[in-house]
Curated annotation (Swiss-Prot):
<keyword id="KW-0679">Respiratory chain</keyword>
<keyword id="KW-0249">Electron transport</keyword>
<dbReference type="GO" id="GO:0005758">
    <property type="term" value="C:mitochondrial intermembrane space"/>
</dbReference>
<feature type="binding site" description="axial binding residue">
    <location>
        <position position="79"/>
    </location>
    <ligand>
        <name>heme c</name>
    </ligand>
</feature>
<comment type="similarity">
    <text>Belongs to the cytochrome c family.</text>
</comment>
<feature type="compositionally biased region" description="Basic and acidic residues">
    <location>
        <begin position="1"/>
        <end position="11"/>
    </location>
</feature>
<protein>
    <recommendedName>
        <fullName>Cytochrome c</fullName>
    </recommendedName>
</protein>
<dbReference type="GO" id="GO:0046872">
    <property type="term" value="F:metal ion binding"/>
</dbReference>
<dbReference type="GO" id="GO:0020037">
    <property type="term" value="F:heme binding"/>
</dbReference>
<comment type="function">
    <text>Electron carrier protein. The oxidized form of the cytochrome c heme group can accept an electron from the heme group of the cytochrome c1 subunit of cytochrome reductase. Cytochrome c then transfers this electron to the cytochrome oxidase complex, the final protein carrier in the mitochondrial electron-transport chain.</text>
</comment>
<dbReference type="InterPro" id="IPR002327">
    <property type="entry name" value="Cyt_c_1A/1B"/>
</dbReference>
<dbReference type="Pfam" id="PF00034">
    <property type="entry name" value="Cytochrom_C"/>
</dbReference>
<keyword id="KW-0408">Iron</keyword>
<feature type="modified residue" description="N6,N6,N6-trimethyllysine">
    <location>
        <position position="85"/>
    </location>
</feature>
<feature type="binding site" description="covalent">
    <location>
        <position position="17"/>
    </location>
    <ligand>
        <name>heme c</name>
    </ligand>
</feature>
<keyword id="KW-0349">Heme</keyword>
<dbReference type="InterPro" id="IPR009056">
    <property type="entry name" value="Cyt_c-like_dom"/>
</dbReference>
Amino acid sequence: GDAERGKKLFESRAAQCHSAQKGVNSTGPSLWGVYGRTSGSVPGYAYSNANKNAAIVWEEETLHKFLENPKKYVPGTKMAFAGIKAKKDRQDIIAYMKTLKD
């Protein structure tokens, strides 16, 4: 994926609810370090039981499935977002999310 394009997509599609900064939660949890992390594990964020109990590790395949249709992949998630249908857009956003780490 194209991380630069993914950053722009993140800013237009995700940044209203998610921070890309370490330790900064918003309506949704911070997505800093999301790649490789287990769902429902950001300190200080009040997750839905569905997300806490899902125990999904956020990697290429799981992020694609979640971003395509969050409520189908994790029924009961608090994420009020219809999803991203275009595979290229998901690939680029995931490429950007991989850069959000120490």
